[in-house]
Amino acid sequence: MGLHIGSLLICVFLGILPFATANTNRSGYEEQRNYLLNIFHNPLVNDSIKEKNIPELIAFYQRYPTDVPLSDADRQQFERFIHDYREYREVLVDGVPPQGGSFGNIFGHFLGRVGTRYISSLFNKKREEGQSNHANSPTTLPSRIQKMTK
């Protein structure tokens, strides 16, 4: 009897676990997306701060590769940017990665083309989700109107 109850509890726990982690993953996604939008979609943030956050942008892109709609051409350009960025960071000067300077050219090229489209797609997806959440939220009629419909 005790073994059956223990097995049942394990099954229930394993059944609930995916739902709990899905909600946690979703909130992590939202938190990271908002963080990136606050940096890359904000004209008041300077390029050096944006450059420092490129690793987070790349990590987000790789963690959620299909969540942001991109054309095949934009996706290929973004992949190329990631390759160029990593190649640049692998070059060592006196045993350390470059500390700035020439990377601005790569970053400027990225922001001017695919980065802007990626961030815009990320922002537009957020706006669309906000509108659909608002549209799907249940509306409660005022009580006097509810009484009339009964």
UniProtKB/Swiss-Prot annotation:
Q: Which Gene Ontology BP terms does the record give?
A: cellular response to heat; cellular response to oxidative stress; innate immune response; response to bacterium; response to heat; response to oxidative stress
Q: What taxonomic classification does the UniProt entry list for its organism?
A: Eukaryota, Metazoa, Ecdysozoa, Arthropoda, Hexapoda
The job of this chain, per UniProt, is described as: A humoral factor that may play a role in stress tolerance.
Which InterPro entries does the record cross-reference, listed alphabetically? Turandot
- This protein's name: Protein Turandot X
Kindly list the places in or outside the cell where this protein is found, as annotated in its UniProt entry.
Answer: Secreted
Q: Where is the composition biased (Polar residues)?
A: 132-150
Native species: Drosophila simulans
Signal peptide stretch: 1-22
Pfam families recorded = Turandot (PF07240)
Chief location category: secreted
Which portions of the sequence form the region Disordered? 127-150
Q: Which UniProt keywords are present, listed alphabetically?
A: Immunity, Innate immunity, Secreted, Signal
Q: Which family does it belong to?
A: Belongs to the Turandot family.
